[in-house]
Amino acid sequence: MELEHPDDLYYLDSHEYVRFDGETATIGLSAFAVDELGDIVFVELPEEGDKVEFEQSMGAVESVKAASDLYSPVTGTVIEKNSALEDQPELLNQDPYGEEGWLIKVRLDDVEDAKEGLMAAGDYRATLETGD
């Protein structure tokens, strides 16, 4: 089965994605990561008002197979978290890129440099294909 990796998103090599909308970034976990983890049973996210830093741990996700840290693809302040995932972590499995499966929304510290260090979708797909 071929996994979807939308072209309008940017990716971190640890498989988090980010969707930019002006000064706001929506962060989630890629379909590849969700598929690798299997059935997700627990999600820990930062609180609104918390600061997240590029490539620093911002939470965790646990599945029936493994536990994994979540890393922030941007630097900024959390303005919203997807609280539905606390009671329904399986939403990540069902819709990682959609209205129900995102993790947090962040107000960016630096809009100009926000994409630095991230991969465009084509580069991310190529990395997955080569296993780098």
Swiss-Prot record:
Cofactor note: Binds 1 lipoyl cofactor covalently.
UniProt keyword Mitochondrion present: no
One record GO biological process: glycine decarboxylation via glycine cleavage system
Domain of life: Bacteria
CDD domains recorded: GCS_H
Residues with PTM N6-lipoyllysine: K65
PROSITE patterns: BIOTINYL_LIPOYL, LIPOYL
Cofactor(s) required for function per UniProt: (R)-lipoate
Keywords for this protein: Lipoyl
GO cellular component, one term: glycine cleavage complex
Domain Lipoyl-binding: 24-107
Function: The glycine cleavage system catalyzes the degradation of glycine. The H protein shuttles the methylamine group of glycine from the P protein to the T protein.
Entry similarity comment: Belongs to the GcvH family.
Subunit note: The glycine cleavage system is composed of four proteins: P, T, L and H.
UniProt protein name: Glycine cleavage system H protein
Species the sequence originates in: Synechocystis sp. (strain ATCC 27184 / PCC 6803 / Kazusa)
Lineage: Bacteria, Bacillati, Cyanobacteriota, Cyanophyceae, Synechococcales
